[in-house]
């Protein structure tokens, strides 16, 4: 991976996104760009035009992307007092739609508009924040219908995109990442005793360490924060 090219973090103002951007700088990436609702240009996941404009801005910088990290996601909606479902009786259509808009549709549009900007000659990496509960094979406890389903759909997008990406550049890598339980606004209501809880900085360091050491055979994989692969 050529660290002199551009590293992009979408969702770079969130707890994990900001920590990822800082870690990339510490790892020697020369140009790290963060994009989100408060960036210039603005990138809003539910607005495809803004995603396209943000991609055009990156293209105008004149260098390819060596690493693209989608650090976006929603688990609960504080504004509307909506939390992950404990039972199918709590399924709410608007909350279900919102989970898919942020966790699935947004990343799909990032893939659409940013993949053409990935380095086509040297190794490039695209990583998207998923969640272990999005694994169908690992679902042992049920619940969290909207979040699980939207992250499972994201994982299918990542797996499918990894196949097409490798056809254009054998060195390109596309993976899903589970950051672990992190002290962030997203996961704060769900932290409990017995869980390994990391700071955003710890999680970012662990994930970047994985990404900079990926091999071509890792393309299309789902990684836990500790480097172990998670079944789809």
Regions found by a protein language model. Give the residues of each.
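Rossmann-fold scaffold of SDR-type NAD(P)-dependent oxidoreductases
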Residues: 10, 63-81, 103, 128, ...
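N-terminal Rossmann NAD(P)H-binding glycine-rich loop of SDR-like oxidoreductase domains
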Residues: 10-25
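Conserved active-site helix of classical SDR/Rossmann-fold NAD(P)-dependent CH-OH oxidoreductases
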Residues: 22, 108, 152-163, 201-208
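Rossmann-fold cofactor-recognition segment
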Residues: 36-54
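Conserved amphipathic alpha-helix within the SDR
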Residues: 51-63
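Catalytic loop of short-chain dehydrogenase/reductase
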Residues: 74-77, 84-102, 119-168
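Hydrophobic positions on the long internal alpha-helix
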Residues: 106, 110-114, 118, 157-158
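C-terminal helical subdomain
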Residues: 176, 184, 189-232
